[in-house]
Amino acid sequence: MKDNYILAFETSCDETSVAILKNGNELLCNIIASQINSHKRFGGVVPEIASRHHVEQITVCIEAALEEAEISADQLTAVAVTEGPGLNGALLVGIMAAKTFAWANHLPLIPVNHMAGHLMAASLVDTIEYPAMALLVSGGHSELVYVEKEGSYKKVGETRDDAAGEAYDKVGRVMGLTYPSGKVIDELAHKGADTYNFPRAMMNTHEVEFSFSGLKSAFINLVHNENQKGNDVIADDLENLAASFQAAVVDVLMAKTKLAMEKYPVKTLIIGGGVSANQGLRERLSAEITDEKLIIPPLRLCGDNAGMIAAAAYIEWKKGLENVQAGLDLNAKPSLVFEDIEEGEV
């Protein structure tokens, strides 16, 4: 049987990435050009800057991917690209590059949901046993997705307001940390203790939903109130603040993930998205998820990368190109979401 090679593009936010996947499980290359240093001084991603960097880096990444994989264009089976969600301008750079490459080399084009990519990164690590549940946590998303069978994604719960990663970055700014601050907060948290009584929103409800805006506000208010009293808690108690904040986030993520698995029993729990790199979350999951298979991708596959897009595209390819192939009129879908699960569907 002829080998399957998928060339994938990912430009949804601030990483320009091109990857080549062989037969759905062998990642031949995963080129990533990061823009973090360009966005640090702004305290977050600036869409216009992100788009310009993608334009500068995309051709370089394509050439590097083909060279590292030792693959020529005529060996490729298909081209895949993130169509959303993400920043509109950033998405368009990847889509235009993918459409151009596909057209020039007479290859089918497969559009991919960015969050399906985060979910299917797990398939590059281990075999997913279905049905599965996925906790996807990043700067823009916090959601639980039920995967009844390969290639079927239904959202069972999400955040009502801020995503977990967004809360980390906003709290990080208050703490005086540079963007992105999640890793530093995690490191500080491991040196401190949960000494502050930060709220755990919706912990005792039976809804599979998150809420982190109240936690963020409570953190900001505590720092402000202490400053009014002449206490600089940022300078004097940074590690305990970080530990208390992280404990509140992880407690909520764990509680709602367990609730989702009670409502929708599964064989595998998958963790994906940038916040899945958090060691505090990984430790809790490893300690408490014992009845289901747990798949947590390595750090290199947690952030945005084209390898995960290729993995999701391979699942789509197996459905038959007549069902998934996009035309050259493919456009960005910045607000693309998974369908909500219907009552009684499972």
Swiss-Prot record:
GO molecular function: iron ion binding; N(6)-L-threonylcarbamoyladenine synthase activity
UniProt KW tRNA processing keyword: yes
GO CC, alphabetical: cytoplasm
Binding site for substrate: L136, V137, S138, G139, G140, D169, G182, D186, N278
Main enzyme class: transferase
Cofactor(s) of this protein: Fe(2+)
SUPFAM superfamilies xrefs: Actin-like ATPase domain
Catalytic activity, reaction form: L-threonylcarbamoyladenylate + adenosine(37) in tRNA = N(6)-L-threonylcarbamoyladenosine(37) in tRNA + AMP + H(+)
Chain sites annotated for binding Fe cation: H114, H118, D304
UniProt-listed Enzyme Commission number(s): 2.3.1.234
Annotated InterPro entries: ATPase_NBD, Gcp-like_dom, KAE1/TsaD, TsaD
Primary location: cytoplasm
Protein origin, superkingdom: Bacteria
Family: Belongs to the KAE1 / TsaD family.
HAMAP family, A to Z: TsaD
NCBIfam families reported in the protein's UniProt record: gcp_kae1, T6A_TsaD_YgjD
Function: Required for the formation of a threonylcarbamoyl group on adenosine at position 37 (t(6)A37) in tRNAs that read codons beginning with adenine. Is involved in the transfer of the threonylcarbamoyl moiety of threonylcarbamoyl-AMP (TC-AMP) to the N6 group of A37, together with TsaE and TsaB. TsaD likely plays a direct catalytic role in this reaction.
The name this protein goes by in its record: tRNA N6-adenosine threonylcarbamoyltransferase
Upper classification of the organism: Bacteria, Bacillati, Bacillota, Bacilli, Lactobacillales
